[in-house]
């Protein structure tokens, strides 16, 4: 029975005893109880340098790892999460608003000829892409896919324009020949892709639709038509398209799919335009405020726009667009003879058809030819159009201009002046002011507004002035006696309008009642029509008259409700009229330039649930501390592989660039050699001609000398040119002495000099061209870079590779760290085994008693605290043999039974023996310093 139980039995009081047991991991000298127990074996071991060295070793290893991580982090600067790009991360990429600063290059065949990169320099966008979820696209672009004026097509057009101006003299000389290769470029048959380098990429929209935004409550027009992209993917290059082209009406069949994708449909199926016969407008809406040619390239704008409906309010390209323009692939399947099916409704060949003003009715400019709309004739013009300029150029490509081009894809440009595409896809002929009358016969029933055309009905064709329920005025256009084709509105109320009307000259008693004049009706007096402001900003009700002609006054909504409007039709359409620059500009609108955090090639599909992936990655990071050894090796291996991969990729790109420069230089050198050969041939021909003249001169001099010697009539000697040989005025028998027949085929001196001058001019030109080609070849050869110069030029690392000279040191350091780590990993278990064998493990038992227990034998004399210590009774000296026996016994009783571990333990017997012997020797000087423990005398309980 323990002391606590005896105390309870005797006193009846509880004696609470707290017993705590914990493993003694950190041994300190002050925690060791002195008394009966001799200083333990572990105490001198703890006081030695063994444990501190291992602590320093751990700190040193951690320092090495932290240093390596810092070095790797500063050099790589990429986290593991950054390798997963554009995947369920709205901040994985950022849109680039100013695309003019984005570097771009073209990729095509014969790249050195056209200043592009080889086809393998960038991955194929059909293979290399990354899908981007709809949520990310919506969050980044807010359902508004913006318009961008890309500078790449403008650069291409500028290059062609510059080349045409530089070779204008040569072009005038060529009459019946073409320059091979250039015609292919001008015709758009040289195709390629536009690519952007890392860290930039292209976000390609693969599914989109349009919807109206910012509806004007006064006019009902949509200030903006926004594009909502619902599916997108990231690529490096665009689709294949012509690198350049002059003005053309029809495009190749290869472009049909890309052009058809630009026919964007409306998102909302409940829009009013969906219920109309023609449906809603399809196409790409170039927004209001777009700059087709930016300010920094204003020299390309020209005077008048050559792009049909793509123009500003002055018919030029100097100002931003003030009216929305739609560009779409024309639906030629329903056309008749190359024209829309309703063109037969034209009146006397008018350009206005069904509310649309059409341009280019007779013919279209196509690759230097004038083609008819029906495809029945084509005329060679001798001129080509590039941008806003026209050049005289002999251009006859190898295609049949008389073929049936009407089935080829063609762009249709529509300029919607009213901008009410969400209400109707039909165009209307605007009414004149004298055709606008007040409805007195209840022709209009219901309540409608500029935003609600279906709220009222009409029963008779006409143009009716209607008092809106919102307080403004409406002009309701009714056609076919029951169809409302348009509503124009203004915030000016009915009372204000009548006050202005009464102030017009001669209109004090006039009205706007309808008179039966024509199908649409009109007012009785045209000089008292709906009022408007003239050019002097004064109110008037009469149209302007000049030379017996009355000016036409049309009406539009909003601010133009009270001004003089000249446009008769609400839409302007044209087909063709675009060149390669604008063709590329339209096709590039499906792309947005973005900047990514990390860019890798290959197909990366979107994961189904990125949150689960992040949780798994977080769990892996939480467990990563158990794999530190493996992690360090893996990081080192990844670093080495990354360096090798980066070097390989960089060398590959540099090699491609070097081949490009080399090929260009070789081609230029070949041209120089050919020019030198031409100069040599011309020189040889000139030498032959000079030699021939010298022979003729010698022969003539010889004959003259013979005549003078034989006749000696110097004063009568006279030579003149006659039938290309020389005769004299002397006697006729003189001619028998000279045989002139051999010189009849020779030219005169004047002809010989003229021909010699021609040879001289030709030779001078050839020598000049040869020198220019030689100089150009030398410059091209000097431009051939080596691998490292190519890397610096392409990537602009500007000394980033300066640290490569430290790679051997880094590699040796890494190998040394690996070896040191391996040695430590081998020695650490041995040291741990040694510590385990040499240091017994104790448990600390703490007994706390509230009262002294009544224990029998409390008055017993226990001595001075040293009597019961067996070790203190006999002072035995520790010898080497005893230490060896003790070490051998520890090895025999070790808990490790595996053969390989026991073999390793044999190596520890000798150091263990030395440790035991040294501890024994060190313990001898403590025998006279034994501490006496005074035991408290326990009194007996009463």
From Swiss-Prot:
GO biological process terms held by the UniProt record: symbiont entry into host cell; virion attachment to host cell
Mind telling me which residue stretches traverse the membrane in this protein?
800-820
Give the Extracellular membrane side ranges: 81-799
**Segments on the Cytoplasmic face:** 821-942
Q: Where is this site: Cleavage?
A: 630-631
- Fusion peptide as annotated region, ranges: 631-651
One GO cellular component this record assigns the protein to is: virion membrane
Modification comment: Specific enzymatic cleavages in vivo yield mature proteins. Envelope glycoproteins are synthesized as an inactive precursor that is N-glycosylated and processed likely by host cell furin or by a furin-like protease in the Golgi to yield the mature SU and TM proteins. The cleavage site between SU and TM requires the minimal sequence [KR]-X-[KR]-R.
Hey, what's the signal peptide range on this chain? 1-80
Which SUPFAM superfamilies does the record cross-reference, listed alphabetically? Virus ectodomain
| Gene3D superfamilies for this protein | ATP synthase delta/epsilon subunit, C-terminal domain
Q: What keywords sit in the KW lines?
A: Cleavage on pair of basic residues, Coiled coil, Disulfide bond, Glycoprotein, Host cell membrane, Host membrane, Host-virus interaction, Membrane, Signal, Transmembrane, Transmembrane helix, Viral attachment to host cell, Viral envelope protein, Virion, Virus entry into host cell
Q: Where in this chain does the entry annotate a coiled-coil region? A: 663-713, 754-789
Q: Where is this region: Immunosuppression?
A: 697-713
Q: Which residues are glycosylated?
A: 51, 98, 131, 176, 228, 331, 348, 354, 370, 379, 400, 404, 435, 441, 447, 457, 467, 481, 493, 503, 509, 527, 534
Q: Determine the domain of life of the protein's source.
A: Viruses
Known role: The surface protein (SU) attaches the virus to the host cell by binding to its receptor. This interaction triggers the refolding of the transmembrane protein (TM) and is thought to activate its fusogenic potential by unmasking its fusion peptide. Fusion occurs at the host cell plasma membrane.
**Quaternary assembly:** The mature envelope protein (Env) consists of a trimer of SU-TM heterodimers attached by noncovalent interactions or by a labile interchain disulfide bond.
Q: What is this protein called?
A: Envelope glycoprotein
């Amino acid at each position: 029975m323990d002391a606590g139980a005896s105390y309870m039995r005797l006193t009846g009081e509880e004696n609470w005893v707290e017993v705590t047991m914990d493993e003694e991991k950190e041994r300190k000298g002050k925690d060791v109880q002195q008394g009966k127990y001799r200083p333990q074996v572990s105490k001198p071991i703890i006081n030695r340098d063994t444990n501190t060295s291992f602590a320093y070793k751990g700190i040193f290893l951690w320092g090495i790892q932290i240093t390596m991580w810092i070095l790797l982090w500063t050099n790589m600067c990429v986290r593991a999460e950054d390798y997963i790009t554009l995947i369920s991360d709205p901040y994985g990429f950022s849109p680039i608003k100013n695309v003019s600063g984005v570097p771009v290059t073209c990729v095509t065949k014969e790249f050195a000829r056209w200043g592009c990169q080889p086809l393998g320099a960038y991955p194929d966008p059909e293979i290399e892409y990354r899908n981007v979820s709809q949520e990310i696209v919506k969050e980044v672009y807010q359902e508004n896919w913006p318009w961008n004026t890309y500078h790449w097509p403008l650069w291409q057009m500028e290059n062609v324009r510059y080349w045409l101006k530089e070779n204008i003299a040569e072009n005038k000389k060529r009459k019946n020949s073409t320059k091979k290769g250039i015609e292919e470029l001008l015709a758009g048959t040289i195709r390629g892709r536009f690519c952007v380098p890392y860290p930039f990429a292209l976000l390609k929209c693969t599914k989109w639709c349009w919807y109206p935004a910012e509806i004007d409550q006064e006019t009902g027009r949509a200030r903006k038509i926004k594009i909502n992209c619902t599916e997108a993917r990231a690529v490096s290059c665009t689709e294949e398209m012509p690198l350049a082209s002059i003005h053309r009406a029809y495009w190749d069949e290869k472009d049909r799919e890309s052009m058809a994708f630009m026919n964007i449909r409306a998102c909302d199926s409940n829009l009013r335009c969906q219920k109309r016969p023609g449906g809603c407008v399809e196409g790409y809406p170039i927004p209001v405020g777009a700059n087709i040619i930016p300010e920094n390239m204003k020299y390309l704008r020209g005077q008048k726009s050559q792009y049909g409906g793509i123009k500003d309010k002055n018919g030029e390209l100097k100002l931003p667009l003030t009216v929305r323009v739609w560009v779409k692939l024309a639906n030629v399947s329903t056309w008749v003879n190359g024209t829309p099916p309703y063109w037969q409704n034209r009146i006397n060949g008018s350009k206005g058809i069904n509310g649309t003003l059409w341009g280019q009715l007779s013919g279209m400019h196509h690759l230097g030819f004038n083609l008819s709309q029906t495809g029945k004739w084509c005329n060679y013009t001798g001129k080509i159009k590039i941008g806003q300029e026209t050049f005289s150029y002999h251009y006859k490509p190898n295609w049949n201009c008389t073929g049936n081009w009407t089935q080829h894809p063609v762009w249709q440009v529509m300029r919607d002046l009213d901008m009410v595409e969400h209400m109707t896809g039909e165009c209307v002929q605007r009414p004149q002011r004298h055709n606008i009358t007040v409805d007195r016969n209840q022709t209009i029933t219901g309540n409608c507004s500029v935003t609600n055309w279906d709220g009222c009905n009409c029963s008779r064709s006409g143009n009716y002035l209607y008092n809106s329920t919102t307080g403004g005025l409406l002009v309701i256009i009714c056609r076919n006696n029951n169809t409302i084709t348009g509503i124009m509105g203004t915030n000016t109320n009915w009372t204000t309008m009548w006050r202005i009307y009464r102030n017009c000259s001669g209109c004090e008693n006039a009205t706007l009642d309808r008179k039966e004049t024509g199908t649409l009706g009109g007012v009785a007096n045209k000089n008292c029509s709906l009022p408007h402001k003239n050019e002097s900003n004064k109110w008037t009700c009469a149209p302007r008259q000049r030379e017996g002609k009355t000016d036409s006054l049309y009406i539009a909504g909003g601010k133009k409700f009270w001004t003089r409007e000249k446009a008769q039709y609400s839409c302007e359409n044209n087909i063709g009229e675009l060149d390669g620059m604008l063709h590329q500009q339209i096709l590039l609108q499906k792309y947005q330039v973005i900047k990514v955090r990390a860019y890798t090639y290959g197909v990366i599909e979107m994961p189904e649930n990125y949150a689960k992936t992040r949780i798994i990655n977080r769990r892996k990071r939480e467990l990563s501390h158990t794999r530190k050894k493996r992690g360090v090796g893996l990081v080192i291996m990844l670093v080495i592989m990354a360096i090798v991969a980066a070097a390989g990729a960089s060398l590959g790109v540099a090699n491609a660039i070097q081949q490009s420069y080399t090929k260009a230089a070789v081609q230029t050198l070949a041209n120089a050699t050919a020019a030198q050969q031409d100069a040599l041939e011309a020189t040889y021909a000139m030498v032959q001609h000079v030699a021939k003249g010298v022979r003729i001169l010698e022969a003539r001099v010889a004959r003259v000398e013979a005549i003078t010697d034989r006749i000696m009539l110097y004063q009568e000697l006279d030579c003149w040119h006659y039938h290309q040989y020389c005769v004299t005025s002397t006697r006729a028998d003189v001619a028998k002495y000279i045989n002139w027949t051999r010189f009849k085929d020779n030219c005169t001196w004047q002809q010989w000099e003229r021909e010699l001058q021609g040879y001289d001019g030709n030779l001078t030109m050839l020598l000049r061209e040869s020198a220019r080609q030689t100089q150009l070849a030398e410059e091209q050869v000097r431009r051939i870079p080596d691998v490292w110069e190519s890397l610096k030029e392409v990537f602009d690392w500007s000394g980033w590779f300066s640290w490569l000279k430290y790679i051997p040191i880094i590699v040796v350091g890494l190998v040394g760290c690996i070896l040191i780590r391996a040695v430590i990993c081998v020695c650490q278990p041995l040291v741990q085994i040694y510590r385990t064998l040499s240091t017994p493990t104790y448990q600390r038992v703490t007994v706390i008693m509230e009262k002294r227990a009544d224990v029998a034998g409390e008055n017993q004399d226990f001595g001075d605290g040293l009597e019961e210590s067996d070790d203190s009774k006999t002072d035995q000296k520790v010898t080497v043999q005893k230490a060896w026996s003790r070490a051998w016994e520890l090895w025999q009783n070790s808990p490790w039974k595996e053969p390989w571990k026991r073999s390793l333990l044999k190596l520890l017997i000798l150091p263990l023996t030395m440790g035991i012997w040294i501890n024994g020797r060190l313990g001898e000087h403590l025998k006279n310093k034994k501490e006496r423990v005074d035991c408290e005398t326990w009194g007996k309980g009463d």
